Amino acid sequence: MLKLGIFMMPIHPANKNLVDCLEEDRNLVIKADKLNYSEAWMGEHYSSSGEPVPSPFIFNASLISETKKIKFGTGVISLPQQHPAIVAGHAALFDNLSKGRFLFGVGAGGLVSDWELFDNLDGKTRALTMLDSIDAILSIWNSNCLLYTSPSPRDWTI
């Protein structure tokens, strides 16, 4: 059976009121749920006034109680911009709050302005950090202790 999903790339005019932008985007996901869409994906951008969602976790959490079946995806969490322990915790909490309606999408980031903001301009470093973050997140989820030493340029110890 064919399933429909929606990828939210909520591009809004820069001068549009932020509250109105977010409400419009929320209403779109609520409507998608009522139309039996199976999933809704929201991206993460910090430096774009046109895509005003720095946390898909928080945006999606605002919709849990207003929807019935739709699954919520992060499209994507930019791993080089965040500590993997924070991402692991937020993802696990969201999955539990949504009663399993969570789809975990990760990546190395897509906006040059975000790379500049977080001083992640080197593509090789971003890619290595992303891969290392995935290992760290899986290690956190699959163990009883939070001991992880990163081989990446970010040198995380958890």
Regions found by a protein language model. Give the residues of each.
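Conserved protein kinase catalytic core
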Residues: 50, 113, 158
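Structural motif
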Residues: 43, 75, 105-107
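Single conserved hydrophobic/aromatic residue that forms the stacking wall/gate
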Residues: 148-158
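Active-site nucleophile and cofactor-binding loops and adjacent substrate-binding regions
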Residues: 74-82
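N-terminal beta1-alpha1-beta2 module of alpha/beta enzyme domains
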Residues: 1-72, 148
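Flexible, glycine-rich active-site loops centered on histidine and acidic residues
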Residues: 2-20, 81-147
